[in-house]
Amino acid sequence: MLRDQTDNTMDMDVLDDVPISDLNYETIQGYRNRHRALKPAHPFGRLNDSEYLRSIGAAAISNIDKCLHPTAAGMLMFGDEYNIVRHFPEYFLDYREILDPTIRWTDRLQSSSGEWSGNICDFYFRVYNKLVKDIKVPFKTIDGNRIDDTPVHEALREALANCLINADFYGVRGIVVRKEADRIVFE
């Protein structure tokens, strides 16, 4: 997008009026645990939470008060929905499973439900698990270890991540992921 063609993109903006405590601690810990499991020797694993958030671009030192605050990206990724919408009023994530055409939906997950954090990170993992639950996994081993990942799993991860990462949360429409009997739609 034209507005992102600078050295500092809008998701790097420091939210000077937001304390770092407005980020969801459980989401951050879950993300860090996944990072540790995937890359146990990564140097970020030794950082405290504040240093970690700075290292991944989720927080930065404000030029105004010289304190650590979430960035726009950090708020979207790790904030609670009720805090996110203060900065992104049209923010909305919606997963709809429509497997029976006679029913409006058979499963639904909305960022605004209040039943979970509503942030991008938690949405990604919750929705990914819903998308892949019906995928057939053929028996395959490599070096004696069972491989449960298929090219379809990889494609779904990539499509969901791209949909969320490349979304314009400053715009007027949220993200809708629809799982239907014969297709998956990202919009």
Where are the language model's segments positioned?
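Active-site helix-to-loop segments that bind/position phosphate- or nucleotide-bearing substrates
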Residues: 1-187
